[in-house]
Amino acid sequence: MKSVVFASLIASALAVPTELAPRTDVSSLCPAGLYSVPQCCATDILGVARLDCKAPKQTPRNADEFKNICAKGGQQAACCVVPVAGQSLFCMTPVGI
């Protein structure tokens, strides 16, 4: 009986990966819920509405990369409600920027 328990502990220890693969987690950039869409926007109106918004051309891995991807196109990183016709009426600054 003890050997079965010992063998199962060894098997489960060997099954655990030794190294985690790097992940791209866009959900950490923008909060879940209403403001969950990462966008690069050209115009900021009083910190609430954003105009000429587009999805980032690359998938950012963190807040600094998100900011830099948008800055390459002369735009600002934002977390928005689902945009309609390029107009994101409700946006906020991403977490970590």
Swiss-Prot record:
Aerial growth, conidiation, and dispersal of filamentous fungi in the environment rely upon a capability of their secreting small amphipathic proteins called hydrophobins (HPBs) with low sequence identity. Class I can self-assemble into an outermost layer of rodlet bundles on aerial cell surfaces, conferring cellular hydrophobicity that supports fungal growth, development and dispersal; whereas Class II form highly ordered films at water-air interfaces through intermolecular interactions but contribute nothing to the rodlet structure. Residues 1-15 form the signal peptide. The gene is hyd2A. Keywords: Cell wall, Cytoplasmic vesicle, Disulfide bond, Secreted, Signal, Vacuole. This is Class II hydrophobin A. Its main location: secreted. Pfam families: Hydrophobin_2. Disulfide bonds join C30-C79, C40-C53, C80-C91. InterPro entries: Cerato-ulmin_hydrophobin, Hydrophobin_sf. It is found in: Secreted; Secreted, Cell wall; Vacuole; Cytoplasmic vesicle. Induction: Under normal conditions on SDAY medium (Sabouraud dextrose agar plus 1% yeast extract), hyd2A is up-regulated at transcriptional level during the first five days of incubation. Hyd1A is the most active at transcription level under normal culture conditions, followed by hyd1B, hyd1E, hyd2A and hyd2C in order. Belongs to the cerato-ulmin hydrophobin family. Disruption phenotype: Compromises aerial conidiation and submerged blastospore production. Does not affect radial growth and multiple stress responses. GO terms for cellular component: extracellular region. PANTHER family: HYDROPHOBIN (PTHR42341:SF1).
